[in-house]
């Protein structure tokens, strides 16, 4: 049995990240999703035995295969939590632990993943919160809980883990909390994302960032 598998759920590439549509075209957003996924998988490959990507979108699965990931076609009439359950069933009996991460956290490489995985050998449940009360990483045994990835999922996951007596351990990380949804998030990538595929792509798009004293902390523009 392997030590740990990563699970990455991806819905689609096309017409995604619509909150960025005033700033990036549909094709640009599609490419952004691909390079962010590449950053996530490049980091995880250093630390996990296999990376499992689950999606119902054939284009996503084909791209995942080009990255040498294990791919699972998501069942019909599914949702994110059902998809994760399907992926965890695949992992159960193959890996002692699983690490669930989203595909849009390109700064994951700045987090000490090795430390978290080492800690997971003696801890039952590790969780990393995202901005706005969500969840951007869980490390646990496959199917240790049924995930609750909707709304304020961080508190829900902690409550469920406590009810299961898993003694959840919280790891706060600015870089892991940064899932990309807004232009200001792109600015953070430009500041902190040195040597990432995502920052390189944003530079190709001539994305610029500077400090700002208005309603947003950063002013993000294209030249």
Which residues fall in each region the model found?
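N-terminal nucleotide-binding beta1-loop-alpha1 segment
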Residues: 1-20
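Short glycine-enriched, charge-decorated loop/helix-capping segments at active-site entrances
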Residues: 20-28
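A short, N-terminal amphipathic alpha-helix
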Residues: 31-49
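Acidic donor-binding segment of Leloir-type glycosyltransferases
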Residues: 48-71
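Short phosphate-binding loop-to-helix
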Residues: 65-99
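Active-site acidic Asp-centered loop
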Residues: 101-103
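Conserved donor-nucleotide/metal-binding helix-loop-beta segment in metal-dependent transferases, i.e.
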Residues: 108-133
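Conserved alpha/beta core of the MobA/IspD/sugar-nucleotide pyrophosphorylase nucleotidyltransferase superfamily
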Residues: 160-223
């Amino acid at each position: 049995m392997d030590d740990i598998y990563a699970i990455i759920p991806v819905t689609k590439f096309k017409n995604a990240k619509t909150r960025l549509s005033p700033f990036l075209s549909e094709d640009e957003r599609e490419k952004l999703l691909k390079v962010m996924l590449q950053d996530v998988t490049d980091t995880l490959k250093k630390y996990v035995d296999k990376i499992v990507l689950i999606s119902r979108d054939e284009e996503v699965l084909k791209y995942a295969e080009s990255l040498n990931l294990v791919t699972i076609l998501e069942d019909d009439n599914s949702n994110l939590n059902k998809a994760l359950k399907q992926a965890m069933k695949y992992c159960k009996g193959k890996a002692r632990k699983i690490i669930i991460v989203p595909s849009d956290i390109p700064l994951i490489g700045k987090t000490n993943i090795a430390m978290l995985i080492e800690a997971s050998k003696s801890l039952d449940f590790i969780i990393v919160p995202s901005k706005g009360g969500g969840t951007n990483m869980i490390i646990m045994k496959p199917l240790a809980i049924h995930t609750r990835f909707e709304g304020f999922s961080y508190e829900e996951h902690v409550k469920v883990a406590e009810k299961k007596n898993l003694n959840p351990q919280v790891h706060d990380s600015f870089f892991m909390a940064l899932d990309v949804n807004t232009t200001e998030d792109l600015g953070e990538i430009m500041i902190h994302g040195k040597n990432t595929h995502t920052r390189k792509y944003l530079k190709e798009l001539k994305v610029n960032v500077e400090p700002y004293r208005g309603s947003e902390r950063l002013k993000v523009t294209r030249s």
